[in-house]
Amino acid sequence: MRAFTQHQGTVAPMDRSNVDTDMIIPKQFLKSIKRTGFGPNLFDELRYLDEGKPDQDCSNRPLNPDFVLNQDRYKNASVLLARTNFGCGSSREHAPWALDDFGFRVIIAPSFADIFYNNCFKNGLLPIVLDEKVVDRLFRETEENEGYQLTVDLEAKTVTTPGGESFSFEVDDFRRHCLLNGLDDIGVTLEDADTIRAYEESRRKTAPWLFNTGN
């Protein structure tokens, strides 16, 4: 998993509440568990004018010109600005996979669905909760200023505007540690590899029958 310390990126505004995981990545794309390749189908039903199919070449599909990610000013966005209850619905982990594969590193919203919020951290995405009034302001500034960027500092737990104003956010210390060091669940376990090996050696001496592999 990629480590996250600080990120500066263009902001794309997703101006709707209750964006669910089926909207983020529709159900027909959930057969794969590779974690990659979902970016072209992110927000598929909003992004394209036709119906998406698994393993389809998306390069020639008709685009919805009104959808935010199809607008030139937002095509390279890596910070998604969203509304309340982002990521609600089913618990599919494909949703953060698709956001990450598209190129997003940060999602900012007034609130997130709990399971989606947890899944983001497990997949290298940083979900940030800011006060709704602050989010409203960021929406206005994003729409008024082409190329609007935010700087997110996970060490300092701040979001900073181009004008230099910073907003603080909260994040659990353990999740912060994992993101700063690029640790997924396996990586966290491997941090204690020496302790685990020492325990296994101790158990071989105190309970050797547990390790008897003979026929």
Swiss-Prot record:
Pathway membership, UniProt: Amino-acid biosynthesis; L-leucine biosynthesis; L-leucine from 3-methyl-2-oxobutanoate: step 2/4
GO-annotated cellular components: 3-isopropylmalate dehydratase complex
InterPro entries registered for this protein in UniProt: 3-IsopropMal_deHydase_ssu (IPR004431), Aconitase/3IPM_dehydase_swvl (IPR015928), AconitaseA/IPMdHydase_ssu_swvl (IPR000573), IPMI_Swivel (IPR033940), LeuD (IPR050075)
Protein name: 3-isopropylmalate dehydratase small subunit
Entry keyword Cytoplasm: no
Phosphoprotein as UniProt keyword: no
Keywords noted in UniProt: Amino-acid biosynthesis, Branched-chain amino acid biosynthesis, Leucine biosynthesis, Lyase
Name of the gene encoding the protein in the UniProt record: leuD
Matching HAMAP family: LeuD_type1
Pfam hit, one: Aconitase_C
Function: Catalyzes the isomerization between 2-isopropylmalate and 3-isopropylmalate, via the formation of 2-isopropylmaleate.
GO molecular-function terms, A-Z: 3-isopropylmalate dehydratase activity
EC number: 4.2.1.33
Catalysis performed (reactions): (2R,3S)-3-isopropylmalate = (2S)-2-isopropylmalate
CDD domains, alphabetized: IPMI_Swivel
Similarity annotation: Belongs to the LeuD family. LeuD type 1 subfamily.
GO biological process: L-leucine biosynthetic process
